Amino acid sequence: NMKRTGFFACGDELVQQLYENIIWGQRGNFLDIPTDCNQRDERLGWTGDIQVFARTATINYRADKFLKKWLHDLACEQRENGAITDVVPDLFNWETVGSSAWGDAGVVVPYWVYRTYGDTQVIKDQFESMKKWILFMESKGSERGLFDTHDCHFGDWLSLDAGDEATGGMTDNDLIGSAYLIYSNRLFIEMGKAIGEDMSYFEELYDLSIKAYRKK
């Protein structure tokens, strides 16, 4: 029962059809949880999919209640070490979790709920979960500021530059991991400041991450 809030119209039939497909794709995948696809039996709440779609989702529909409920589930599934599961709900209880871009849904989704609707309550609700995820990434680095020693990254998933049979692209997984540490930490700092939290530790980490990333 989400209210439609975003509309688009243009004179190009193909562009217009693409937009309509996006709307129907969201409608088909926003049933109780944000799923990855509704046309096959898997239908799991893959965190990576909503991470990249959250901004669009919050523009198309009034999706804050839907996403905040799912974020509560995400925090409940989060491992003690801060790793975020690759699917929420975590139906399979996989041992290897915490992939960059997938786990970053725990920061990126609250960010777009906050930015689109001006909702600071989502920051307060998810603050500890977001903090645990940032600290988890920090703990998995060859030096402080990198996220490059974790052994579970999907990387540039389904990119075609590595050939038709490959599931991941040619971009180094650790490069993507460290880039997402920088990205999510920047969003986390902005949100923390919005609710009056002291973010000095994470600002220092952000500066170190930039330097370490450029050096590597």
Predicted regions mapped to residue ranges:
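Structured core elements
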Residues: 85, 182-183
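Aromatic/His-enriched, Gly/Pro-containing loop or helix-boundary segments
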Residues: 90-98
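Heptad-repeat amphipathic alpha-helical coiled-coil interaction surface used
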Residues: 114, 182, 188-189, 206
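Active-site acid/base region of carbohydrate-active enzymes
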Residues: 2-21, 27-28, 34-52, 56-86, ...
